[in-house]
Structures are given as C-alpha cells and as structure tokens.
Amino acid sequence: SVTTIREMAFYNCAYLQSITLPAGTESVGNNAFDTCTSLETIDFGGAKTIGQSVFYGCTSLKSVTISGECTEISVNGDGDTPFMDASALEEIIVTEGSGNYCTENGVLYNKDKTTLYAYPSAKKDKEFTLPSTVKEIAQSAFYHAVNLEKVDISGVETIGTYAFEECSALKSVKTTNTITSLGVDAFFNCTSLKSLRFGDKLTTIGSYAYGFYYNEDADPEND
C-alpha cells in the first residue's frame, strides 16, 4: 500500500477535484499538489508529516482534512505554512489523535491551543474571537482573510510576521495589555483598519507592522 507521496507527485493535475489519501500514508512531500487548480477537497489520510507548499497554486481548495496523528506541517523557506497558498480555503479539519495539532470551527491550532497556526483565508465569518488559551498568533496565520471584519485577540502575547497581512475588510482589533511583540508586516495592507491600541508591554515592533503601499501617481488629489 502507499505510504509516501513524493514531491510534486500530483503537479498540475488540472482536473483533479477531490482526493483522499490511504490511511497507511506516512508522509506527503513538498509541493505534492502544486498547481492542482481544480482541487476543492483533500483528506491526507494517515499522513504524519506534510511537506512545504503542498497547496501552492491550489486556487479552488475549500476543505482540508488532516490526520489527528500528524506531527509536522512544514513551513517554507520564508516560514509560511502551506495554508497561505490556499486563497479559497474555508475550513481545516483535524481528526482525533495523539499528534501535534487540533482544530476548532475550522481553525488550526497546536494541540493545547496556545498557538493559532492558520485561519482559512475564505472562512465566511465576519467576526472571530480567539480561545482564551492562545498566546501566539503564528506567521501568516490570518493572511488574506478576506471576510474578517472584527477580531478579538485578548490575551495574546506574540503576533507573528505577516499575521494579518492583506486582511482588507478588517476594521476592529480588540487587544489587551499582554502583547509584547508585533512581527514584520503584521497588519500590513489592512486598508480598512483605522486604529490599533497596544499596552506598555509591547517592546518589539517589526518593520511595516502596519501601513500599506502608497502609489502617489494613483492618488487623484495629487493629479
């Protein structure tokens, strides 16, 4: 039976819409489903390790199911999880098991829910409140969450690089005086966000943590 899905194994399978890997699958290689543009659902079967950029170019992917025995979801060279590449993703499901991950309402966390790893980009909810256990928002966790307008991150201590980048609908972020670190580009290009409030525990602010690209030539007031 199949135990390994190698790198680029399903590369550019343009008509593949759904796939369920065997329960005996142990590992899935880097870019395994690269450019599967029609793929909407994937079940990783029993895979314990999932490689880098496995969803690169999977522009139709809506649902991902991961084994509860999974111990590693690899990040790429820039530190991003594979979910950053899935712009149509609505839910992530982790089955029961003794691995390192869990999900709640389609959102991916580590097992004890102290780190939020991935919020699906196309999740339909407009408001979201993090579980009180979460202390860290991982790199790119909310990247391009296009429907998210209001988020409550009370109790969080660390906000990773690119954490909320390109959340263009985001208008409100509720925080508490617990945040100590704000990563590079953390709220970059959140064009609907008018204000952010942090307490005096914040000691590190990464470059371009909030802001947006400004094109002077495109501003009618400067014509």
Question: What residues fall within each predicted segment?
Answer:
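Surface-exposed beta-strand edges and their flanking turn/coil or helix-capping segments
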Residues: F10, G77-G79, T129-P131, F142
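Beta-strand repeat architectures
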Residues: Y56-G57, D78-A88
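Structural signature of tandem-repeat unit edges
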Residues: S1-T4, C13-S27, C36-T49, T59-E72, ...
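A short acidic (Asp/Glu
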Residues: N76-G77, Y208
